[in-house]
Amino acid sequence: MNYRLSNNNIDILFRTEPYTELCYFGKRLQNFQPEMIDMLYPAVPNSRIDVNVPFTLCPEEGLGNFSTPGLEGHRNGKDWSPVFTTKEVNKTDNSITIISEDNIAKLRLTSFFILDKSGVLQCQNTLTNLGDETYQVNRFSITLPIPERAQELMAFSGRWIKEFFPHRTKISHCGYLQENRRGRTSHEYFPGMMVGTEGFKEQTGEVWGIHLGWSGNHRIQVAVKSNGKRFIQAEALYYAGEISLAKGESLSTPWLYATYSDEGLNKMSQHFHQFLRSNIIKFAKNKARPVHLNTWEGIFFDHNPDYIMKMATKAAQIGVERFIIDDGWFGKRDDDYQGLGDWYLDERKYPNGLEPVIKHVKDLGMEFGIWVEPEMINKNSDLYRAHPDWLLELPGYQQPEGRHQYLLDLQNPAVFEYLLERLTWLLSSYNIDYIKWDMNREIVQPGHEVNPAIVGQTKTLYRLLDILQEKFPTVEIESCSSGGGRIDYEILKRTQRFWTSDSNDALDRQIIQRGMSYFFPPEVMGAHIGGALCHTTFRELHMNLRGLTALFGHMGVELDPVKVSEQEQNGFAYYINLHKQLRPLLHSGNFVRLDVDDNLAMQSYGVVSQDPKEAVFIIAQLTLPTYALSGNLRLTGLLADKQYQIEVLDMPDNIDPKINGHVMKELPQWMKDTTTLSGDWLMNVGLPLPVLDPATAILIKVTTK
């Protein structure tokens, strides 16, 4: 039997007898008939297996498939090469569930595919042990074929304070393999990538995008077989002996999210953004994302309630809507060497409790938030002195420190109950609207008792967050992991915001936030205006670039508002107010990135309303322009037959020749006065760009008349 999943843009075709194959994933087909799928049976070449070798949902060596199998495992050395035959298919309008079995190996494979109206395909495999003996699983993946014309790959690498930096490579015989073994989603290898036709861009080319929703170790590969067939394979990465299934037990892969675009990366991103907005993001749609002030870069561990209330007063005056006390409020947390795990209020710093501070914040009309890092412990803590056996470690080995801290074993029932009790106390005792949930180190030798435990640790974290969300449904949670070390769709099901990076350097943030935008919409991307001197790079940047960079996310600020100059306060207030004016558009529209000619020196992106009657775009000059003039900027996403009025909302102080003349003697004509041009002109001819200094930006808005 042949089956089809379809929406207005995408078709996914299956052949299920005797083995299930996903035969096509791409542009919607016109005048489709199910029997057409049979035309996809290929030629059988000489000097190979004498029959067609199907490429199934879980590729099997036993069928003559010499690529990486979808399942590797055994039952005491037996049943190591299963072959799954289709037994049952259940189809609805937007989903298909396929049950396949190997009666010899006594294994069942259940494959789930759901095609959302956004154009995102959700895929998952589940393995069930039907035999009497335990089945040891070494690897278990979800596999998607891609066409031969997918010649190029774009993925993301990075490190702390440098997340989501893109890189491209040609897909050749050796393929591409990405592994993350750091115990969290990681800064180094985001579990998502795109493959596409050679030279695919933001607005052109065919693109297939995938993301593995998993917050632990992962492996993703793009492979090319000797017959030219290509595939993507994604999975949670297991330690040796980590996963075994007793009779009747099941194991599921993480959900894989995939989509197709025939209009470049922008359309791919819009599919992912629409999917998240409709299915995963959990804050009230009618509630604006409040502007944050986090105290960390203002006071670090030096907590004084009277001074913090002064900070809150100043914060409210510049337009802050959510005030967050960061690290240092609990235990004897005077530095990062001590106190983690002691989730009791530090009465030395807060002799009257947190209530006076919270009341002051609320009276100013702001929400109140607080920082926690529940998964961690310092050895210099009351908790460790009482329970040294609560660490996540392998007995007999010396666990290395990371940022002076260690991990708690969440699978230990006593640890889980302690954390649940302390967090319940915190959220029940105080009027808290938001918690920043941090996780500040990588995981080495993660042993639960003597067994490897990353999968269990990750799933138990999910369970803890699920319970807290059920008990406190109005409390929002931010996922932070030394910045962007835990950003993925599965953790987003339990949180409402990501701390994108510990870097507030606006030049680096331009690249980091652009990279994140391929998979996540602006409203979940924490983007703060930092101080003039960035604490991670020691670069000093103008407020213009800092403010406009933070504008395109869930805005916040990092400062001590009591100490900054009046000029800086005015700058923060200006960009906060500008963000609030544009927030309804920024957090509901279609995010677009523009292809610019001088893409090493400049980048441009924006948000277009769903109508699309209005849009806002930033042009950010990162380095010195390659040429004296930067050419024309062609916009995207507009209505060709509509007239748009163009307005410059923000630009550097030194750009106007009448005032300064530092970079230009004449502005481009469209910047001299109110200009109206057609969408067709703006998208095909474009606007001549002004000359900009490095580390500056302009913001323009276009609106239909």
Predicted regions and their residues:
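Polysaccharide-binding surfaces and accessory modules of carbohydrate-active proteins
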Residues: 1-14, 20-223, 239, 643-664
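Carbohydrate-binding surface patches
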Residues: 9, 194, 202, 597-639
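Active-site neighborhood of glycoside hydrolase catalytic domains
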Residues: 351-353, 385-387, 391-542, 554, ...
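C-terminal beta-sandwich/jelly-roll accessory domains of carbohydrate-active enzymes
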Residues: 623-705
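Aromatic-lined carbohydrate-binding/catalytic grooves of carbohydrate-active enzymes
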Residues: 284-421, 434
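Conserved, mostly hydrophobic/aromatic
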Residues: 9, 125, 248, 293, ...
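Glycine-rich, aromatic-flanked loop segments that form ligand/cofactor-binding clefts
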Residues: 50-55, 60-81, 204-217, 259-283, ...
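Short Pro-Gly-centered flexible turn/kink motifs
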Residues: 84, 243-262, 695-702
